[in-house]
Amino acid sequence: MSLKNRYRETIRPKLLKDLGFSNLHQVPKVVKINVNRGLGEAAQNSKALEASLSEVSTITGQKALVTRAKKAIAGFKIRQGMPIGCAVTLRGERMYAFLERLINLALPRIRDFRGVSPKSFDGRGNFTLGVKEQLIFPEISFDKIDAIRGMDITIVTSARTDEEGRALLKEMGMPFRSN
C-alpha cells in the first residue's frame, strides 16, 4: 500500500482520534517537501552546478531549479544573480513517493544511523533534515558522482504545533531518535 493510501485509510483516522480533533480537515497532513542544496563552489565551478542539478533531479524525479544570490557578498566572492545552488519543491504523488523512499530506503542506508533528531521541528510543525551525502539514495551510484555533497530536506505540514507534526511523521514511519 502506498504512503498516500495508508495516510488516508489508517493514519488520518488514528490521528483524528489520538489528537482529539472533531473534523477530518483538522488532522495534519504533509503539504510539500522542499529539497535544497547550496553550492558554494558553483560561483567558480559551473560543472559542479550541472552535476548537482542532475543529481537532485534524479533523486526527486522532478527538474531542479537553480537558486541565485539575492545580493552580492564580497567575503564569499559572489555577485547578485550568480547561481549558488538548486532546489526542488515536491507536491502530490511525487511528494508521497519521495517521502516513502526517504523513510524506507535512504535513511536506513546512513552510516551509524540511530534515528533522526526529534528536535528538528521549527515550532510550527515543519520538519527539516540535513543529509550529509547523496549516496544514501539508491538512484545515485558511487561511480557517477564527482564529489560528495549534502542537501537539506524540509517536510512542510499543515500541523499547528510540533507535537502534531511529530505525531504525523511518526505514524508515517519516520524513525525518530529516542533521547
Curated annotation (Swiss-Prot):
Record bears the keyword Cell membrane = no
Q: One Pfam family, short name please?
A: Ribosomal_L5_C
For biological process, the GO terms are: translation
A GO term for molecular function: tRNA binding
Under Gene3D superfamilies, the record lists: 3.30.1440.10
The alphabetical list of record keywords is: Ribonucleoprotein, Ribosomal protein, RNA-binding, rRNA-binding, tRNA-binding
Self-association or partners: how does it assemble?
Part of the 50S ribosomal subunit; part of the 5S rRNA/L5/L18/L25 subcomplex. Contacts the 5S rRNA and the P site tRNA. Forms a bridge to the 30S subunit in the 70S ribosome.
Q: Which family does it belong to?
A: Belongs to the universal ribosomal protein uL5 family.
Q: What's the protein here called?
A: Large ribosomal subunit protein uL5
Which species expresses this protein natively?
A: Prochlorococcus marinus (strain SARG / CCMP1375 / SS120)
